[in-house]
């Protein structure tokens, strides 16, 4: 049963005034009943008559010609069938009903109630939905506010780090500049001392040359004297002819020479020191110290992993694990995750060895043999060091003994994929253990092996 609500400000297509008792012709124009050329009867033109639309003058046989448009008072709704005000609502058909509709046979068995009563559950549902939407909106706004605060904190941290970097490099530049000035000042002072000692040396030589010149002149004159005169002063003349040993002065004192040599050695090492500093700085800034965890899909049945996948220990009783092409069988091995196919990476492992136990730490190629007979060598894609109480060696081919005074309590691994370099070191003392030169063709993974009861490896950092 169609309904048409009230139309605020509706205008008649004919008189252009406010619609009164509106009807709509088949052509689509809506106008007041009083504007019809023929008087309406019961809200419709008789079917035997021809309607002439007062607007478009279109003649059309209609049956019925007019459709009442029940606008009613502003804000009210009327039944199109009976023209009565709507008071009821049918829950079953979701229709608005007037008094006549309510008493009709179509809704006798239906749940029909007053509009105010029928609308309340819908209002309640709408209010519930509205409250839920408001709550959701508030939660989103709160979340946005929290994330904005986090963002502001991160931005503030970045700004602080920028200032820290600027200040650090400024201090470094100042320190380098100061060392440059000190070094140049020392060189200038040595240069001054060299000139001073040179002048002193030249002065002594000049004095000796002058003295010798005087003696030469005197002796030349004596040689020209008659024999009687020369023999009169024979003893004096003999003493003058005696050669005096000339002690040559030092052009530069030994102390000054030592200072020059010491400074020379220090200057010679400057380029290497600066190169090493630059490389270490680049390595530090470009090396990824991301989190490495143990991959349970690769773990040998002889190994037990911690829940956080940071620690592995050896067990005599093999576990019943699902078979996997990734799992190592035979050697008590587990790989780390993720694997690497580029870049620089580093991680550290804490070592704890049981009696007679040992461990292996390094990297391994993706295509390494995991089933059957397995070997530990660089030729088979394993670049690692084997540490035990009896012997320590690197997995070169043949193996390289490592003269370690003690087993490192923490081993650091530094991987440079592009350079083909795997360096292992004592993470506590920074002393190198061994460095491999390799050529990687695929992904490489952190490699760990541990054996004997009481032996354990734990990833740190």
Swiss-Prot record:
Its EC number is 2.3.2.27. Interacts with paxillin/PXN; this interaction recruits TRIM15 to focal adhesions. Interacts with TRIM8; this interaction prevents TRIM8 cytoplasmic translocation. It comes from Sus scrofa (Pig). Belongs to the TRIM/RBCC family. One of its GO terms (molecular function) is molecular sequestering activity. Residues 123-230 form a coiled coil. This is E3 ubiquitin-protein ligase TRIM15. InterPro entries: B30.2/SPRY, B30.2/SPRY_sf, Butyrophylin_SPRY, ConA-like_dom_sf, PRY, SPRY_dom, TRIM/RBCC, Znf_B-box. Gene3D superfamilies: 2.60.120.920, Classic Zinc Finger, Zinc/RING finger domain, C3HC4 (zinc finger).
């Amino acid at each position: 049963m169609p309904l048409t609500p009230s139309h605020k400000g509706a205008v008649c297509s004919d008189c252009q005034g406010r619609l009164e008792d509106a009807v709509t012709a088949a052509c689509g124009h809506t106008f007041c009943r009083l504007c019809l050329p023929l008087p309406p009867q019961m809200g419709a033109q008789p079917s035997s008559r021809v309607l002439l639309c007062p607007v478009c003058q279109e003649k059309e046989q209609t049956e019925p010609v007019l459709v009442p448009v029940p606008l009613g008072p502003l804000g009210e709704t009327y039944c199109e069938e009976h023209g009565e005000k709507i008071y009821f609502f049918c829950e079953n058909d979701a229709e608005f009903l007037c008094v006549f509709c309510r008493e009709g046979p179509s809704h006798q068995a239906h749940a029909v109630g007053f509009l105010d009563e029928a609308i309340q559950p819908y209002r309640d549902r709408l209010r519930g939905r509205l409250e839920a939407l408001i709550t959701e909106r508030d939660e989103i706004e709160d979340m946005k506010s929290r994330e904005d605060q986090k963002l502001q904190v991160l931005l503030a941290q970045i700004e602080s780090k920028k200032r820290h970097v600027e200040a650090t490099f400024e201090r470094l530049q100042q320190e380098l500049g100061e060392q440059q000035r000190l070094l140049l000042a020392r060189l200038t002072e040595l240069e001054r001392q060299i000139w001073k000692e040179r002048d002193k040396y030249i002065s002594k030589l000049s004095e000796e040359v002058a003295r010798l010149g005087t003696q030469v002149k005197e002796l030349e004159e004596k040689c020209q004297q008659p024999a009687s005169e020369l023999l009169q002063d024979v003893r004096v003349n003999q003493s003058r002819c005696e050669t005096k040993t000339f002690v040559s002065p030092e052009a530069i004192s030994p102390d000054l020479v030592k200072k020059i040599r010491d400074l020379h050695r220090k200057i010679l090492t400057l380029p290497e020191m600066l190169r090493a500093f630059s490389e270490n700085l680049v390595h530090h800034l470009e090396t990824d110290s991301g989190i490495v965890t143990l991959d349970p899909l690769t773990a040998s049945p002889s190994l037990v992993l911690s829940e956080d996948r940071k620690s592995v220990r050896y067990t005599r009783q093999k576990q019943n694990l699902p078979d996997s092409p990734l799992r190592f069988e035979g050697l008590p091995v587990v790989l780390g995750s993720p694997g690497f196919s580029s870049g620089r990476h580093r991680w550290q492992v804490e070592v704890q060895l049981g009696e007679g136990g040992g461990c292996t730490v390094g990297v391994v190629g993706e295509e390494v043999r995991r089933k059957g007979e397995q070997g530990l060598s660089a030729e088979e894609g394993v670049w690692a060091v084997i540490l035990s109480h009896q012997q320590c060696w690197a997995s070169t081919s043949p193996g390289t003994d490592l003269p370690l005074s003690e087993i490192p309590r923490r081993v650091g691994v530094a991987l440079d994929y592009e350079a083909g370099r795997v360096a292992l070191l004592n993470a506590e003392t920074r002393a190198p253990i061994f460095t491999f030169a390799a050529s990687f063709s695929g992904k490489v993974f952190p490699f760990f092996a541990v054996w004997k009861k009481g032996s354990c490896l734990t990833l740190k950092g």
